[in-house]
C-alpha cells in the first residue's frame, strides 16, 4: 500500500523501517533541520537520515497547515494511509482527509490516559504499573481520535522513562503493521475514547527540583520518570546534585526531610516526608554520573547535611 510517513525523533525510526519493509513509502515529512552541538551545525532528524538511506523524498515544513505546496504534493501522491509517529505538528482536517483509509497515529500510552507530549515520562512519574502503545485514527484534536489497537507492557519498579521509550519504540512498528492490515481488511473497528484521562504535558526543568517533603516513593518515581532528561536534582552544600538511580526504604524517621542519615558504598540514605530514599547514582557539576561507591572513593558526602538547602 502507498504510505506517507510523518515522524521526527529516534522513537519513530523502527516504525518507519517496518513500513519500508512491508509497504511502499512514497514520501516522508519531518521537522526542519535544527542546530546541534557546540558548533550549532544544522542536523537532520533521525527520520530524515533514515529516509535518505532509502532515497525516499523528504519534506520539512515549518508549519504544515500553512504549506500549500506540500499539501498539494500529498494530494498528488494520493496515499492509502498517512502514518504519524512523533511528528511534532498538528494535522488539519484538510490533511487528515487526504488518505483513502485515514491517518494513523502511534501514541506511546494506553489511551485515553496520558494524551499529550510526554506520556513516557508522566506514566512513570505517576507510579503506574503498566503502559503501552495505542494506534488511533487521527482527528483534529490532540490524541483524541478513535482507538484501533493497543499493546500493553509492564512497568517494573526501577524502570526509567528511557527504558520504557526503548521498549515501546521497538514494539510500535509491529502494532502499526497489524493496524494497517486490520483497517484495510475491515477486521478492526475503531473505538471511541471514553473515561478517565490525564494530560501528559511537556516537561519543564522546574519539575525536576526534588521536594524532600514528598513521600520517598513519589521522589523515586520522579527520578525514574525524568531519566534520561531532564534528570531530577537537589542541592548538596550549594552544588547541584543530579539523581540517576534510587530506591525506597520503608522506614519512618523523625529527622527533617532532606537530612542525610547514612552514607556507605550502597547508597546515601535521605529522610523524606514519608519513608527514606536511598540514592545509588549521582552526578555533580563537571563530573560524570557515578554510583555512590565510585563517588565516595574519591570524594565525601557528609552525614547530617540537609539536601536542598
UniProtKB/Swiss-Prot annotation:
Belongs to the Fmt family. (6S)-5,6,7,8-tetrahydrofolate binds at residues 109-112. Its EC number is 2.1.2.9. GO terms for cellular component: cytosol. It comes from Clostridium botulinum (strain Eklund 17B / Type B). Keywords: Protein biosynthesis, Transferase. It holds the Pfam family Formyl_trans_N. It catalyses: L-methionyl-tRNA(fMet) + (6R)-10-formyltetrahydrofolate = N-formyl-L-methionyl-tRNA(fMet) + (6S)-5,6,7,8-tetrahydrofolate + H(+). Coiled coil: none annotated. One of its GO terms (molecular function) is methionyl-tRNA formyltransferase activity. PROSITE patterns: GART. The gene is fmt. Attaches a formyl group to the free amino group of methionyl-tRNA(fMet). The formyl group appears to play a dual role in the initiator identity of N-formylmethionyl-tRNA by promoting its recognition by IF2 and preventing the misappropriation of this tRNA by the elongation apparatus. This is Methionyl-tRNA formyltransferase. It comes from the Bacteria.
